[in-house]
């Protein structure tokens, strides 16, 4: 019987405001982290943290994550199309503000994102999302911890070792 790979956290890192929080939570739970960016990004030196410079293509970092993510992994991204791809692959996906993306919500989220993009490009709406707040940071930490615990409960326990 093969053992399930440990949960890995993938970070869409180019504009992620909660990288430091992810590193701390991952270390506490002993989970590996892949920090994926389009180019070089500074990360702490730690055996659980892997830095990936995916290349300068428009969606290089997104493609790198989407091609590797598996059920039971966690992806942190504000990129709705990437979130959609990862949800379809069976991953748990969180926005940096702690909002989870799910199979039930991703279709509507993607439709709203596309509508807002069209409205912005036509000049109907100017500006972008509100700024990131300490409340968002706290909500993210709570959501990440809850997600890790939920995944751990779903994974089968390792077989008991025979006593000698």
Swiss-Prot record:
Segments traversing the membrane: none
Lineage: superkingdom: Bacteria
Cysteine disulfide links: none
Alphabetical list of InterPro entries matching this protein: UPF0178
Cross-referenced HAMAP family: UPF0178
NCBIfam families: PRK00124.1
Family: Belongs to the UPF0178 family.
Stated name of the protein: UPF0178 protein RPB_3201
Provenance organism: Rhodopseudomonas palustris (strain HaA2)
Lineage: Bacteria, Pseudomonadati, Pseudomonadota, Alphaproteobacteria, Hyphomicrobiales
């Amino acid at each position: 019987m093969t053992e399930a790979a440990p949960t890995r956290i993938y970070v869409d890192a180019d504009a992620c405001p909660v990288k430091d929080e992810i590193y701390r939570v991952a270390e506490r739970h002993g989970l590996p982290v892949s920090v994926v960016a389009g180019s070089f990004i500074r990360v702490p030196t730690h055996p659980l943290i892997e830095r990936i410079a995916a290349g300068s293509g428009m969606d290089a970092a997104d493609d790198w994550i989407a091609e590797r993510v598996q059920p039971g992994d966690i992806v942190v991204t504000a990129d709705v199309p990437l979130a959609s791809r990862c949800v379809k692959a069976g991953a748990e996906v969180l926005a940096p503000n702690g909002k989870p993306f799910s199979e039930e919500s991703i279709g509507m989220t993607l439709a709203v994102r596309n509508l807002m993009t069209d409205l912005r490009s036509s000049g109907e709406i100017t500006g972008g999302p509100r700024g990131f707040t300490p409340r968002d940071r706290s909500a993210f930490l709570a959501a990440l911890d809850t997600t890790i615990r939920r995944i751990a409960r779903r994974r089968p326990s390792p077989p008991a070792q025979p006593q000698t």
